[in-house]
Amino acid sequence: MKSVATSSLDDVDKDSVPLGSSINGTAQAETPLENVIDVESVRSHFPVLGGETAAFNNASGTVVLKEAIESTSNFMYSFPFPPGVDAKSMEAITAYTGNKGKVAAFINALPDEITFGQSTTCLFRLLGLSLKPMLNNDCEIVCSTLCHEAAASAWIHLSRELGITIKWWSPTTTPNSPDDPVLTTDSLKPLLSPKTRLVTCNHVSNVVGTIHPIREIADVVHTIPGCMLIVDGVACVPHRPVDVKELDVDFYCFSWYKLFGPHLGTLYASRKAQDRYMTSINHYFVSSSSLDGKLALGMPSFELQLMCSPIVSYLQDTVGWDRIVRQETVLVTILLEYLLSKPSVYRVFGRRNSDPSQRVAIVTFEVVGRSSGDVAMRVNTRNRFRITSGICLAPRPTWDVLKPKSSDGLVRVSFVHYNTVEEVRAFCSELDEIVTRDT
């Protein structure tokens, strides 16, 4: 599977990329900024979207797919729990096994290379417990300062417990783009040493939406014997297909509540990483031959996990990644063109273009001289749009990297494919009214 997040957009129709975007730095011909998807058809899959408020807080959590809800309802109505060995129980087990295989294939993994958990935060903590026996105070961990706290806290905890040195990997900026932080291998290489055992970063920044060059990072990390790359994919998977084999990561984690599903996480661990580095934290009598056997503590939530298979089918077959990428690129283009047209009013963070090889549909900014929290509150209380403000559960990227002037952080607007051109244009008008007329 070709990963749009790491490729040259071979899977995207380049003639359909909208005005204001570029592919590999080359400007494209102007095309109308219109919806790429059939809005009514897509929204028929999301019952919650029938209200008057447009969800522009999707990086915090998306609405749930109808077919996923129905899958859970059907399972709980139809199957016994816990399952036994009778025909009905075996039918339930077959459904569960098929779901797990489909989820694994979604990221080009094998079924014994994935496990489910409560959240990405929880799964990284469990992974830390599993890796703990092969770490000591002579090791070093490299952690990106662009990490969401979920991708940092497990390793900070381990470093404190074991006396491990943490080296902070700062993003690169330029004098011409001081508000556009990007992770590069050039800034990573000086931090690596023969003692480095873990490098952790996110695939996409949940704060500014920038796509990081994970395969390039993996190639550098793996020049150090015994060094592993741990990637937080939460902000990537709603927007791009992911191929963990192509990325050559050791561990990759994401959350389904950001992907039109339940509050559930999935962790990938390569077979090589499992065999070389991981210790089972499960009951002594549970086989540790799979990732489930090593990390899946207690009885799994079958009813929630079965929500994932319909989501995979919807993304890959009903809508398709090509249209998802194109729709979101149009939406980002409209918002960025508005924000960047008023440089004295808005300070925009991250990529200043909508090139889908460089960013996803997360746009962060602050209003000059205004409280970000106040701006977001004024938008939200009008009940037409739902946006977020603050630190996005990422204090280091917010305060240490971006350094907003507002004492209460940033304003974040995040789209997915079910958002529309009409909504974004209306949002720009409403935001303009709020920042220019409201006091």
UniProtKB/Swiss-Prot annotation:
Annotated EC: 2.-.-.-
Superkingdom of the organism of origin: Eukaryota
Keywords on record: Pyridoxal phosphate, Transferase
Keyword Transferase annotated: yes
InterPro entries for the chain: Aminotrans_V_dom (IPR000192), PyrdxlP-dep_Trfase (IPR015424), PyrdxlP-dep_Trfase_major (IPR015421), PyrdxlP-dep_Trfase_small (IPR015422)
Kinase among keywords: no
Cofactor(s) for this UniProt protein: pyridoxal 5'-phosphate
Entry binding sites for pyridoxal 5'-phosphate: 120-121, 206, 255-257
Pfam family, one: Aminotran_5
N6-(pyridoxal phosphate)lysine found at: 258
Free-text function comment from the UniProt entry: Cysteine desulfurase-like protein; part of the gene cluster that mediates the biosynthesis of the secondary metabolite ustiloxin B, an antimitotic tetrapeptide. First, ustA is processed by the subtilisin-like endoprotease Kex2 that is outside the ustiloxin B gene cluster, at the C-terminal side of Arg-Lys, after transfer to Golgi apparatus through the endoplasmic reticulum (ER). Cleavage by KEX2 generates 16 peptides YAIG-I to YAIG-XVI.
Protein name per UniProt: Cysteine desulfurase-like protein ustD
